Amino acid sequence: MSDSQHTIAGTVLTMPVRIRKADVHTAMFSVPADAAQRLVDYSGLQVCEFRPGRAVVNLMLARYIDGDLGKYHEFGTCVMVNPPGSDARGLKALGDAAAFIHHLPVDQSFTLEAGRTIWGFPKIMADFKVRDANPFTFDVSEGGSLIAGIEFHRGLPIPSLRPRSQVLKTYTFSEGTTREVPWEMRNSGVRFRPGGATLRLGDHPYAKELASLGLPKRAMVSGSVANVEMTFGDAHILR
């Protein structure tokens, strides 16, 4: 990761951008691979088939509490894709796959501008309603139209002797360019369970795109992370 700088709304950000405290809820859905591929064809990337004819879409809510981009909420639609040049399949391939970010609504203008400018993230302004209980629920809307709502039931704690650091990558597409975003994550307070999350789609155009995937109402796997630290480096152009 470099120490380059970017000026966003008069504020100088020195790379890597640091997120010191966040929490995340995520739901993993199994969808037809051909539908997922149609959704991301514009990126030039290939979805990862973890089973014959099946791909993975993750829907997540992240609450950024303390970081260089400020305090905000973020909803992500992430399609798991193979690294460029790979056509690997199966569960092992899924372990090597990365998230292509197709939707990324947020509720603060600074992170919107930074995300678009530095990494090509497809951020739009949206409204969030969160009920922090068990079950944990949230709705995300834009312009008065519901995109999605998800209800999460608490998962089982995953034991860890110490917070683990993971080196990851994410792909974005903006203005005809596909980029790879390197980032590192350190987390603790992890919970997972089979199922455990129920999806409700609205009438927003994003919701219609999600419906085109044949998303089931119930997730294959869901989870939460109570404490997340992240660093994001500069994006690299792929094509």
Residue ranges and their predicted role:
Residues S2-T11, D107-R239:
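Interaction-surface and assembly-scaffold signal
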Residues I8-V12, R20-T26, L45-P163:
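Structured soluble/peripheral alpha/beta segments that form catalytic or ligand/cofactor-binding pockets
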Residues P16:
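A mobile, often basic/glycine-rich helix-loop segment
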Residues H25-F29, V221-G223:
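Aromatic-acidic/polar surface patches that form glycan- and anion
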Residues V31-A33, P83, D234:
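Non-catalytic surface loops within mature trypsin-like serine protease
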Residues V31-S43:
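Amphipathic alpha-helical segments
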Residues A35-Q37, G67-L69, D87, A207-E209, ...:
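Residues in flexible loops and secondary-structure boundaries
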